[in-house]
A protein has these predicted regions:
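A beta-strand edge to alpha-helix "cap/lid" segment located at domain peripheries
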Residues: 1-29, 37-132
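Helix-to-beta-strand junctions that scaffold the AdoMet/dcAdoMet cofactor pocket
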Residues: 32
Length: 132
């Protein structure tokens, strides 16, 4: 694992820590300030722009929209220059979601520019070849 991949995994872990702790200030600090951002929450229309994205997280974290617990499992980091992404499973009560988190390097730190989470079918209904 490269140093950049470790840094990206640390940024990804900070995202899930902010989510689990329902900390809107920590969540805000993780999102890019210069690069355009977007987010696709499960069941929502896509959100574009920092104000809409960070505002959605503030509502989710403070108004009861967050799951009671969430764990990031099987994270896989990929780095291409100043851009990186993590593909992982989000484990929540009652199921799993597939998630992709994209990051860019801003002022020396990895900042999130996109989060997309989608529900996975139950294990019995997953297609052949699905890797768990």
């Amino acid at each position: 694992m490269t140093a950049a991949e470790r840094e990206v995994l640390e940024a990804n872990a900070a995202f899930y820590a902010a989510f689990e702790q329902r900390d809107p200030e920590a969540m805000d600090a993780l999102w890019a300030r210069e690069a355009p951002v977007a987010c696709l929450h499960p069941g929502w229309e896509p959100l574009f722009g920092r104000e809409a994205v960070v505002g959605s997280w503030r509502r989710i974290l403070l108004e009861g929209g967050a799951p009671p617990e969430i764990r990031c499992e099987r994270p896989s980091a990929h780095v291409a220059g100043e851009t990186a992404w993590v593909v992982c499973a989000e484990v929540v009560p009652g199921g799993e979601l597939a998630a992709t988190n994209l990051f860019v390097r801003e002022k020396g730190a990895w900042r999130m520019v996109h989060h997309h989470a989608s529900p996975l079918p139950p294990p019995a209904r997953r297609p052949a070849g699905f890797r768990n």
